[in-house]
Amino acid sequence: MAIILCFLILLPLILIFLKKLKHSKWKLPPGPPKLPFIGNLHQLQELPPRNLNHKYGPVILLRFGFVPLVVISSKEAAEEVLKIHDLECCSRPETAGTRKISYNFKDIGFAPYGEEWKAMRKLSVVELFTAKKHQYFRSIREEENDLLVKKLTELALTRSPVNLKKTLFTLVGSIVCRIGFGFNLHECEFIDENSISDLVDKSEILEMTSMFSDFFPGGIGRFIDWISGQNKRFDNVFSDLDTFFQNILDYHLKPGRKVADSSDIIDVVINMIKKQEKDGDSFKLTTDHLKGMISDIFLAGVSTSASTLIWAITELVRNRKVMKKVQEEIRTTLGDKKERITEQDLTNLHYFKLVVKEIFRLHPAVPFLLPRETLSHVKIQGYDIPAKTQIMINVYAIARDPKLWTNPDEFNPDRFLDSSIDYKGLNFELLPFGSGRRICPGMTMGITLVEFALLNLLYFFDWGLPEKEEADKIITGNGVAVGLVQVLLH
């Protein structure tokens, strides 16, 4: 019995030793020095996204507890991960926060690669984010922008400051709620339209805050999460989100509710569930899949588009010559007497498109994209990357790489005048939406939403700062969209 007990105690140490012996033959990426047991956790606050690659190169290995993580910071390495080895690198790590917000990975964004994810992805491509659906929802996008223009016009007449964050989160939230969930946010009974940004902030807490059990799997990590109160804090934050998502679901399942001829996205999924019950399909959609889909649409759709619009106005206020040039193009092309503009007016605006492209370059909404996880051993830039290694693509650093861009920190749309570089996943120096199997499925909707809202903001209004505000002091942060809180328009 004593021999068996000793063997069980020593077994984990033996396995760790054998694993290290195997990996000692590999060429692993360089990285900062690591401490026993905790790895690089003690350096977490000292690792800003742009400075990692300056010392260690474009492929860097970190270790947080027992979790290996590789940071990719060059165009060439990103292409290897997202194109050459896309299949081997296309899964997602399973963390406590993403598990909760995705309803146990029953969504598209955070689900690990497998048959269930492929079925959900097919659903999004074939049923939800089609060109026909996108065109049908055009009227909703135009109506909500009309309301925005009306509201801002009233503020402009009194020279009142605009809370840009609240205004743009409400706009994007209103569009997403009508397209995705079929209800009017301005008349909603279960959420106030001004609470949208607060809900998104709570979701980002769940997505970005790590649990000890993420780094130390097993009983030790779970015990620390419990005794530190981390579990309870997570549950409290998630409770408001879950209540909102459940209200959306109840709204759709309400007896006697009238459904439009072209249903919203959740109606489509509910109808598929009913169809599967009759047909006996092998893949069964559940209520958790519905909530996971709601979570993806609301959180990804609102946060990314709203933060991009905030940065757009922020950069244009800081760069008055660019704002003047793009407004002259818009007002010359469309004329200066239009009472209302439509998405058709987005055509023939060449410089405007360059401005949007430059915003996506300087301020990607998700600076590291969503983390990937390797399904098997791969080689990236000559380095061995073991299976079950997390990979983060530092698109923020790549888009500011001086080897790729002249004066990379400068806001200069003219850099794209004679360039064919685009942001739709084929050019690896510009990847705001990712690339490969995990490219953002709602990319087309997001691009149109940003372009059309920005067109309205620039056609109807001139933008400036409140008195005593200085343009060179309004941007802080490290790739995360904080931008302006208040601006003036007239």
Curated annotation (Swiss-Prot):
Annotated organism of origin: Arabidopsis thaliana (Mouse-ear cress)
Residues passing through the membrane, by range: 1-21
Family to which the UniProt record says this protein belongs: Belongs to the cytochrome P450 family.
Keywords in alphabetical order: Heme, Iron, Membrane, Metal-binding, Monooxygenase, Oxidoreductase, Transmembrane, Transmembrane helix
EC number(s) per entry: 1.14.-.-
This protein's name: Cytochrome P450 71B29
Gene3D superfamilies documented for this protein: Cytochrome P450
One Pfam family in the UniProt entry: p450
Class of enzymatic activity (EC top level): oxidoreductase
Cofactor entry: heme
Subcellular location: Membrane
Binding residues annotated for heme, in chain numbering: 440
PROSITE patterns: CYTOCHROME_P450
Listed SUPFAM superfamilies: Cytochrome P450
GO molecular function terms attached to this record: heme binding; iron ion binding; monooxygenase activity; oxidoreductase activity, acting on paired donors, with incorporation or reduction of molecular oxygen
